[in-house]
Amino acid sequence: MSAQPVDLQIFGRSLRVNCPPEQRDALSQAADDLNQRLQDLKERTRVTNTEQLVFIAALNISYELTQEKAKTRDYAASMEQRIKMLQQTIEQALLDQGRTPERPGQKFE
């Protein structure tokens, strides 16, 4: 489906953006999150310049995204290492099983 215009209110300003219908709810949640972040920043920093608040919020969001990407990379590397260890353990167990007779007195040919 093609994108459709969506009207948003960001920190008291109207903004119209195009968005696929199936992503409309996610966009609305993102706008709500941004509004909350801007409001929190305004209260915490006492900055009244909207443009400055938007830049600070953008930097914070970018930093959080960078941190999450690093966590994801670290997690993927950790899982890859665990999978390799499990694979080696399984391969060794299969090799050991092939070397060990299943019943006492059974001999390999």
Swiss-Prot record:
Signal peptide: none annotated. GO terms for cellular component: cell division site; cell septum; cytosol; plasma membrane. Residues 21-97 form a coiled coil. Pfam families: ZapA (PF05164). Keywords: Cell cycle, Cell division, Coiled coil, Cytoplasm, Septation. SUPFAM superfamilies: Cell division protein ZapA-like (SSF102829). GO terms for biological process: division septum assembly; FtsZ-dependent cytokinesis; septin ring assembly. Its main location: cytoplasm. Gene3D superfamilies: 1.20.5.50, Cell division protein ZapA protomer, N-terminal domain. It is found in: Cytoplasm. InterPro entries: Cell_div_ZapA-like, Cell_div_ZapA-like_sf, Cell_div_ZapA_eubact, Cell_div_ZapA_N. Activator of cell division through the inhibition of FtsZ GTPase activity, therefore promoting FtsZ assembly into bundles of protofilaments necessary for the formation of the division Z ring. It is recruited early at mid-cell but it is not essential for cell division. PANTHER family: CELL DIVISION PROTEIN ZAPA. Belongs to the ZapA family. Type 1 subfamily. Homodimer. Interacts with FtsZ. HAMAP family: ZapA_type1. This is Cell division protein ZapA.
